């Protein structure tokens, strides 16, 4: 199998990288998991309950859970893993603000005691990036220090002898894994492994990967490049399959701390300037795999809505954008756009953005570098003259928009937030209510209010939504389609 | 000669030290942050800062440098930031594929290239010379990835005679090992073969016009004896230099072929390490490749004594 990007970091807790999360899903297990409808289901947990005052959750582990080294999974492992995960993952950090104590009661039972009720606790424990349960001795290490022992309790075992980091990773079926009896459903249900071994190959060249798929040397390419899709589609031995139907959202972050985007009018100018179809065409080519997006809360999610989306119209509106930029007091300051040279889609969209900005009179400079250079530079809050930046394009999963309480892209808490650092106290007070909302309807109403405010302050701009088809040989079946990560249980290789 | 070898060995250490200092400083000055690469696309600045602190990347550069030199002198090239394994272990995993490919390429390039060069010089100006010179020019001009994909299409996809990609260690059997290396070796050999053929032709042409060649012909020496025993031996020094330097270049520079054929060699290791900002691996590989380069040069210099008895060290 060839993953979208090769496994770099083994510790899925210390990183948000998607491939590391897929690695985590293979070798680790989780307390809860999301099913295909994104509902929370118990996974390692057999049963759980909440006290009458809604402040103490008790969790009991199911029978048969064991580490790959032969020892049993205990409640102490879970307690240490939750604490470690909460050090770095936004959901955990949020939860810990309300936690009074996490402690084990006996070998199979632990509790989370809260200072005040937190109805979304199971959702937080099940949210992405997942809370992977590690051995206590591994989980006692700081979350900023990578755990590379690769010993979990999941349905696959990491084969250290055959794995060559950076070249190939080998997983063997964990014969001792006891799956739940339910049918596999999303990340939840019975994790039944139908293959003896899975090998991830690091085939860097897409053409080689395709040739290997065609020759039957590999069975799966998670993210084939756009130019290969028509060729794959025409091959009767191969099939394109969209596993993450929600897809991802290409988005533009603006440095709200520096000129000109510290002025809301200049950010609104960008919102009006962007013709999503043109950007999607430049980035992805085939309309079959992209669509426009107007709701802050993604396409086709429970919270998608049309509040305050009047700025959107087919074809963009450069005249309005030009007027707004002028009204913002823009005086020709240099706008630096970070351009990732090793991410073709984003690079193409970046060049289009530069061209569109120049058309409305902006003084634009592209700053090309590989993604490694961008992730360092995007952290700089200062002006472009001091090595800062004005704009960069990234993406997030459509699904993540349903979790505004944990998705840092959707925050507007200034310097405490994510790159771009938009600030809106009004929006943040609305976002804080998300945790208090008790029903879906309440959250839907809240989503409309949040969106109304957000498209006024324009904390970021959506450039469009896209799905990434995967390519597989017809003989590989049973792949589970979920956002971003690839579970490997349930899949099987049939003859032919 | 012993003194010469010892002196050269000392110079090898000096070169490795200079490469080490240069690479260390260059990496710290270049944009990019391994902590950010570990943390992933959506990580917060706070988490990245925590990882930087944990990895010691916030220490002043001189402190990091002294720590690194101390470890190197103790034989510890460090641990990969991402894989969490010793750098030497990772390099040793990747050496076999690269050395296998480099050695096979050099054997094929040198054998065929020298033969082509001799033939072209022997029949200088004739049809054979024109064909071989044309081939050499073509060999230089066509990028290796084009040749690679062309070979993959015919010999792996159309006929299924050979695998598309991958590498099998020699311990898994000679044939599986060889089968996986045939296409990459041919691909990589073509430019080197062309280069060696041209150098051999030029050297041979120079020697063939010497007086002693006319003397050998007057003595009634056979064409084979004249070409191989008289001419080739005297034309050998520049050919050996080219072969030696090509081999040294191959060990550190086969990244395109390794990428096209998905061979997990040293070239791929260092390119991935650069993309990930995995400093210990980049530093380790470059120092070792520099050392290897100097040693191969030494071996080439010493081999001159085999073809030219006038050379003494």
Residue ranges and their predicted role:
Chain B
Residues 2-4, 13, 89, 93-128, ...:
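Alpha-helical transmembrane segments of integral membrane proteins
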Residues 9, 51, 61-77, 87, ...:
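Hydrophobic alpha-helical segments of integral membrane proteins
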Residues 15-66, 83, 159-180:
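Hydrophobic alpha-helical transmembrane segments of membrane transport/permease proteins
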Residues 16, 20, 24-29, 145, ...:
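Membrane-embedded alpha-helical segments of multi-pass transporters/permeases
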Residues 16-21, 138-150, 243-248:
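Hydrophobic alpha-helical membrane-insertion segments
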Residues 23, 27, 31, 35, ...:
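Membrane-water interface at transmembrane helix exits
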Residues 58-114:
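An internal, D/E-rich "acidic patch" concept
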Residues 84, 133-198:
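Membrane-water interface segments at transmembrane-helix boundaries in multipass membrane proteins
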């Amino acid at each position: 199998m060839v993953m979208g990007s090769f496994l770099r970091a083994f510790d899925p807790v210390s990183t948000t990288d998607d491939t590391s999360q897929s690695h985590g899903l293979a070798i680790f297990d989780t307390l809860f998991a999301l099913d295909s409808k994104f509902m929370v289901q118990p996974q390692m947990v057999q049963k759980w309950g909440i006290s009458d005052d809604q402040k103490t959750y008790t969790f009991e582990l199911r029978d048969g859970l064991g580490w790959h080294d032969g020892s049993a999974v205990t409640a102490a492992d879970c307690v240490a893993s939750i604490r470690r995960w909460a050090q770095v993952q936004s959901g955990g950090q949020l939860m810990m603000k309300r936690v009074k104590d996490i402690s084990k009661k006996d070998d199979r039972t632990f509790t989370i005691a809260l200072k005040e009720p937190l109805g979304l606790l199971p959702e937080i424990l099940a949210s992405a990036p997942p809370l992977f349960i590690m051995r206590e001795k591994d989980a006692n290490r700081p979350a900023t220090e990578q755990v590379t022992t690769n010993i979990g309790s999941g349905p696959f075992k990491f084969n250290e002898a055959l794995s060559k980091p950076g070249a190939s990773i080998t997983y063997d079926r964990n014969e001792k894994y006891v799956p739940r009896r339910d049918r596999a459903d999303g990340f939840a249900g019975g994790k039944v492994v139908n293959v003896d071994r899975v090998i991830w190959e690091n085939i860097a060249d897409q053409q080689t990967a395709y040739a290997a798929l065609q020759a039957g040397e590999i069975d799966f390419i998670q993210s084939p490049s756009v130019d290969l899709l028509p060729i794959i589609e025409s091959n009767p031995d191969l099939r394109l399959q969209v596993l993450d139907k929600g897809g991802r959202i290409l988005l533009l972050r603006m440095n709200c701390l520096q000129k000109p985007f510290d002025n809301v009018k200049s950010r609104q100018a960008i919102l009006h300037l962007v013709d999503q179809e043109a950007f999607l065409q430049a980035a992805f080519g085939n309309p079959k795999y992209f669509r426009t997006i107007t709701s802050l809360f993604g396409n086709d999610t429970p919270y998608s809505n049309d509040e305050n989306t009047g700025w959107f119209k087919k074809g963009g509106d450069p005249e309005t954008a030009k007027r707004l930029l002028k009204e913002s007091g823009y005086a020709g300051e240099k706008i630096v756009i970070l351009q990732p040279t090793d991410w073709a889609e984003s690079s193409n969209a970046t060049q289009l953005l530069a061209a569109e900005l120049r058309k409305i009179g902006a003084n634009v400079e592209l700053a090309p570098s590989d993604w490694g250079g961008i992730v360092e530079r995007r952290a700089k809050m200062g002006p472009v003259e001091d090595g800062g930046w004005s704009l960069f394009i990234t993406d997030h999963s459509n699904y993540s928009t349903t979790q505004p309480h944990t998705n840092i892209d959707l925050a507007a808490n200034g310097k405490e937030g994510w790159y771009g650092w938009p600030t809106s106290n009004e929006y943040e007070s609305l976002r804080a209510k998300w945790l208090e909302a008790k029903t879906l309807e309440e959250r839907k109403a809240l989503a409309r209010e949040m969106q109304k405010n957000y498209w006024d302050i324009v904390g970021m701009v959506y450039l469009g939504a896209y799905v990434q088809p995967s390519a597989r040989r017809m003989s590989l079946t049973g792949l589970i389609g979920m956002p971003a990560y690839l579970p490997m249980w349930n899949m099987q290789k049939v003859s032919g | 000669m012993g003194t010469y070898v010892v002196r050269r060995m000392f110079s090898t250490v000096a070169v490795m030290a200079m490469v080490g200092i240069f690479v260390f400083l260059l990496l710290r000055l270049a944009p990019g942050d391994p902590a950010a690469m570990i943390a992933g696309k959506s990580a917060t600045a706070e988490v990245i800062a925590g990882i930087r602190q944990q990895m010691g990347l916030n220490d002043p550069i001189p402190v990091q440098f002294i720590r690194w030199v101390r470890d190197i002198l103790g034989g510890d090239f460090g641990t990969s930031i991402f894989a969490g394994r010793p750098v030497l272990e990772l390099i040793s995993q990747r050496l076999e594929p690269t050395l296998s490919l480099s050695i096979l390429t050099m054997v094929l390039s040198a054998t065929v290239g020298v033969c082509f060069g001799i033939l072209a010089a022997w029949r200088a100006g004739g049809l054979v010379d024109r064909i071989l010179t044309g081939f050499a020019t073509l060999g230089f001009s066509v990028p290796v990835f084009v040749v690679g994909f062309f070979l993959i299409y015919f010999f792996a996809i159309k006929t299924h005679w050979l695998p598309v990609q991958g590498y099998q260690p020699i311990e898994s059997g000679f044939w599986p090992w060889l089968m996986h290396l045939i296409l990459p070796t041919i691909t990589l050999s073509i430019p080197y073969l062309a280069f060696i053929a041209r150098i051999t032709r030029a050297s041979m042409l120079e020697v063939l016009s010497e007086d002693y060649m006319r003397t050998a012909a007057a003595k009634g020496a056979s064409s084979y004896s004249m070409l191989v025993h008289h001419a080739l031996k005297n034309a050998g020094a520049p050919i050996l230099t080219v072969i030696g330097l090509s081999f040294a270049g191959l060990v550190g520079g086969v990244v395109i072929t390794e990428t096209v054929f998905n061979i997990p060699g040293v070239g791929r290791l260092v390119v991935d390490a650069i993309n990930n900002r995995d400093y210990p691996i980049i530093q380790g590989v470059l120092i070792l490749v520099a050392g290897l380069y100097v040693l191969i040069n030494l071996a080439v210099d010493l081999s001159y004594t085999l073809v030219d008895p006038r050379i003494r060290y």
